[in-house]
């Protein structure tokens, strides 16, 4: 049972997994989700998820953002890359994601949480300081866009 759950949630991988996120702005707000699964469970972050076999980064981002938020986007070029490596108490790698965040253009839709997102919404620069936001998301938004500075 544990082995099936571990494989289902991508725990204890044999190799790093590639994942994408999409940075989407609308009316001076950024689209964020509150994660419902590890890694970053409970934190607000750029929406995204795993790339499937045969899928481009752009198509993966468009699919994942639609699944997690109900918002349609048009993804473009990579703008930020980072690793998420989480180890268990014994030091064994529990998760290892290589995450590529892409710039994206809002197309249509209103945020509604889906897939593994607990919440999804547009967040203004003024309110981002009141949320528990993942460090990678804070770094990206502040350093690349001056958002929330």
Predicted regions and their residues:
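Acidic, metal-coordinating catalytic segment for phosphate/diphosphate chemistry
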Residues: 1-21, 92
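A cytosolic small-molecule/anion-sensing beta-strand core signal
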Residues: 26, 34
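Active-site-adjacent beta-strand/loop module that shapes the phosphate/pyrophosphate-binding cleft
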Residues: 82-110
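NUDIX/MutT-family hydrolases
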Residues: 101-103, 112-143
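The catalytic Nudix box helix
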Residues: 46-79, 102
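A conserved beta-turn-beta hairpin within the catalytic core of GNAT-like acetyltransferases
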Residues: 38-44
């Amino acid at each position: 049972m544990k082995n099936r759950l571990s494989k289902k949630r991508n725990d204890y991988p044999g190799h790093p997994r590639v994942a994408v996120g999409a940075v989407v702005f609308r009316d001076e707000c950024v689209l964020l989700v509150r994660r419902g699964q590890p890694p970053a469970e409970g934190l607000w972050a750029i929406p995204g998820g795993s790339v499937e076999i045969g899928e481009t980064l752009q198509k993966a981002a468009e699919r994942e953002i639609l699944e997690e938020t109900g918002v349609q986007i048009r993804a473009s070029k990579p703008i930020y890359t980072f690793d998420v490596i989480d180890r268990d108490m014994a030091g064994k790698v529990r998760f290892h994601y290589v995450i590529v965040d892409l710039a994206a253009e809002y197309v249509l839709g209103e945020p509604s949480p889906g897939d593994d997102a607990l919440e999804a919404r547009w967040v203004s620069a003024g309110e981002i300081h009141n949320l528990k936001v993942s460090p990678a998301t804070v770094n990206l938004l502040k350093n690349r866009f001056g958002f929330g500075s």
